[in-house]
């Protein structure tokens, strides 16, 4: 009985749908339909062979029109006139629906390049996930899926392939889309397939053959966008090295296992070549190929001297080296001792090094006999009859009677023996540039006044000159009536002479007083003195700015910079914008000299340094080795005199206002 009932219900459903309904040759009376047997159709489908369409006759015997009909899980749509919609789109309440060839509304399905959702409505401007294809699609405003194009959706860019599939975790030209399909914006990306990092720029494309600055470091992206790592890059006429993490090597050492050598990379990442580097409390030299000099000799054309670099590249200084079956000595500045005497405090003996730096032995040099070990056999360097001595080391200190340092003087300077004070085997009482003190005998070499040059002063009738070397003189004052033209005068302080006292107009001038010259007048100095190619030219305004800000005389600043930098034309001036010799130590002037960013900063920065280290400490005038700036600023005992001479020369050219 149950089986018969089930078959009956199924038959009723079948007959209630278009598939189960049968064609009829009945007639229409308005919206009603009379079947062939004359009965009135109701609650059933009718196929009219004349109109070739299905109609649905409702319970009130009228056909359904402009409305939906649900039968089971299916929906049908009856159009105006009662025709059943099939294989077509129907618009209802602003939405579109698709009825298939059987008239059923499609749901969760593709219709061409359109998609209808769970309600049957066509999807518009929304995402669609199709589990059959395991892919995402996007339906645009026109109801069609995106295809072979980029779309920006809610601020993110997506790419859709042929067929509308969303591209994920792949490259598309120079762009990359992540696992969610969004185009990767600015930042790093690691691609496992290529086992490399890439950098995506702000425009969404990967960086290619270019530098990127990120989080305080530079990186280089090669052709194809691959990040350079553990490799060299040639760019901007220099080599650069990208470390294992891709960061550019900068201000650091790098060991290259391929060449088995160390290299140094400066600020900006440039490989150092033909250059010195101060690091680890030592000097190192990087050769023309960038490799560190190690266990070898290097000739530096700038200083015109040989240097030796030990294992690890450390510069040898104050040390002996055995090489080429001879001993060599590297001085405190690292230069090879050559054609000179060297006192070794360890063995407490003098040695002589010939041309090429070879140590002399078993021979006589300048009348002094050297033994088989190279030591001088002649005993003392002093001479009881000598009145003058010359400084032997690069610099040597002058001490008071208690052994406290008073000042220091440069190699080659000539000191007077002060016979009014006691000297002994270890120290000599001397006088130089106004300073009286004591110097170690080992730092001095006796001079023969009848043969050796002794500094002197002389007047030509117009100017009074200080001859500090045989071919070098400094005009220090105007001729005085008490002076005898052509006569050589000698003075231990440069002020007191036989028959007169010299008044140097600028040597003891208070440098905290402003000059009477304007910036424009200071600029004229270069043309008046015929000085060309100077970095200091037209910098009068900067000198005056320094004067106003730091209260230091601008004329002095110009003269000081002129002396130290050869009027802004020296190598240190050109390479480092250092015009005042700041930290240009006697042993390593170029290497140790401070670097300034530009000319103006070189002038202003040095003025600030001078104020803090000299003016503010009471040394407000140039002076000599007894007082003033010259005591500590320079080892040259006549440094102050030389600057004062330049000031005098400029003052005369500009009209004598100071």
Curated annotation (Swiss-Prot):
It is an enzyme of class 3 (hydrolase). One of its GO terms (biological process) is cell wall organization. Its EC number is 3.2.1.96. It holds the Pfam family Glucosaminidase. InterPro entries: Cell_wall/Cho-bd_repeat, Glycosyl_Hydrolase_73, LytB_SH3, LytB_WW-like, MGlyc_endo_b_GlcNAc-like_dom. Keywords: Cell wall biogenesis/degradation, Hydrolase, Repeat, Secreted, Signal. PROSITE patterns: CW. One of its GO terms (molecular function) is amidase activity. One of its GO terms (cellular component) is extracellular region. It catalyses: an N(4)-(oligosaccharide-(1->3)-[oligosaccharide-(1->6)]-beta-D-Man-(1->4)-beta-D-GlcNAc-(1->4)-alpha-D-GlcNAc)-L-asparaginyl-[protein] + H2O = an oligosaccharide-(1->3)-[oligosaccharide-(1->6)]-beta-D-Man-(1->4)-D-GlcNAc + N(4)-(N-acetyl-beta-D-glucosaminyl)-L-asparaginyl-[protein]. Cell wall-binding repeats lie at residues 42-63, 65-84, 86-105, 124-145, 147-166, 185-206, 208-227, 229-248, 250-271, 273-292, 294-315, 317-336, 338-359. It is found in: Secreted. Residues 1-23 form the signal peptide. Belongs to the glycosyl hydrolase 73 family. Plays an important role in cell wall degradation and cell separation. This is Putative endo-beta-N-acetylglucosaminidase.
């Amino acid at each position: 009985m149950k089986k018969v009932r089930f078959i009956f219900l199924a038959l009723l459903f079948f007959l209630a749908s278009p598939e189960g309904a049968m064609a009829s040759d009945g007639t229409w009376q308005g919206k009603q339909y009379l079947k062939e047997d004359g009965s009135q159709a109701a609650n059933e489908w009718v196929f009219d062979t004349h109109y070739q369409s299905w109609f649905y006759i409702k319970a009130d015997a009228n056909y359904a029109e402009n409305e939906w009909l649900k039968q089971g899980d299916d929906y049908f749509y009856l159009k105006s006139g009662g025709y059943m919609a099939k294989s077509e789109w129907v618009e209802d309440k602003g939405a579109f629906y698709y009825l298939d060839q059987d008239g059923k509304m499609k749901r969760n399905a593709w219709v061409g390049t359109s998609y209808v959702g769970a309600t049957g409505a066509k999807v518009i401007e929304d995402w669609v996930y199709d589990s059959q294809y395991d892919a995402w699609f996007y339906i645009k405003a026109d109801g069609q899926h995106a295809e072979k194009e980029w779309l920006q959706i809610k601020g993110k860019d997506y790419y859709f392939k042929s067929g509308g599939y969303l591209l994920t975790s792949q490259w598309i030209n120079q762009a990359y889309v992540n696992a969610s399909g969004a185009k990767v914006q600015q930042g790093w990306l690691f691609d496992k397939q290529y086992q490399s990092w890439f950098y995506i720029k702000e425009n969404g494309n990967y960086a290619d053959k270019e530098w990127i600055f990120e989080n305080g470091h530079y990186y280089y992206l090669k052709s194809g966008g691959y990040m350079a790592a553990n490799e060299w890059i040639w760019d901007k006429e220099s080599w650069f090295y990208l470390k294992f993490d891709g960061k550019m090597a900068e201000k650091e050492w790098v060991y290259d296992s391929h060449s088995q050598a160390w290299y140094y990379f400066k600020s900006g990442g440039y490989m150092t070549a033909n250059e010195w580097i101060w690091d680890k409390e030592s000097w190192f030299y990087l050769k023309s190929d960038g490799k560190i000099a190690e266990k070898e000799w290097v000739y530096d054309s700038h200083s015109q001297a040989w240097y030796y670099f030990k294992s690890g590249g450390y510069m040898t200084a104050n040390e002996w080296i055995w090489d080429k079956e001879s001993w060599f000595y590297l001085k405190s500045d690292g230069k090879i001792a050559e054609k000179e005497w060297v006192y070794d405090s360890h063995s407490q003996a003098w040695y002589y090094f010939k041309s090429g730096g070879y140590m002399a032995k078993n021979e006589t040099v300048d009348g002094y006999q050297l033994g088989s070990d190279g030591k001088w056999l002649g005993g003392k360097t002093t001479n009881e009859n000598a009145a003058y001595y010359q400084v032997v080391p690069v610099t040597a200190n002058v001490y008071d009677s208690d052994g406290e340092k008073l000042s220091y003087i440069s190699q080659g300077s000539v000191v007077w023996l002060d016979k009014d004070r006691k000297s002994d085997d270890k120290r000599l009482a001397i006088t130089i540039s106004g300073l009286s003190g004591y110097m170690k005998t080992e730092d001095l070499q006796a001079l023969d006044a009848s043969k050796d040059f002794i500094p002197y002063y002389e007047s030509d009738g117009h100017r009074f000159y200080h001859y500090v070397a045989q071919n070098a003189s400094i005009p220090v004052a105007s001729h005085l009536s008490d002076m005898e033209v052509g006569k050589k005068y000698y003075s231990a302080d440069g002020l007191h002479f036989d028959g007169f006292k010299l008044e140097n107009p600028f040597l003891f001038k208070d440098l905290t007083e402003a000059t009477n010259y304007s910036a424009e007048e200071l600029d004229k100095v270069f043309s008046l003195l015929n000085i060309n190619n100077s970095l200091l030219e037209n910098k009068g305004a900067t000198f005056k700015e320094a004067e106003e800000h730091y209260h230091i005389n601008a004329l002095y600043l110009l003269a000081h910079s002129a002396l130290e930098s050869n009027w802004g034309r020296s190598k240190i001036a050109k390479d480092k914008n250092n015009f005042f010799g700041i930290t240009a130590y006697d042993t390593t002037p170029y290497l140790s000299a401070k670097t300034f960013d530009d000319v103006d900063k070189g002038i202003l920065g040095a003025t600030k340094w001078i104020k803090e280290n000299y003016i503010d400490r009471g040394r407000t005038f140039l002076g000599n080795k007894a007082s003033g700036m010259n005591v500590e600023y320079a080892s040259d005992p006549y440094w102050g005199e030389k600057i004062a001479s330049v000031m005098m020369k400029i003052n005369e050219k500009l009209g004598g206002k100071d």
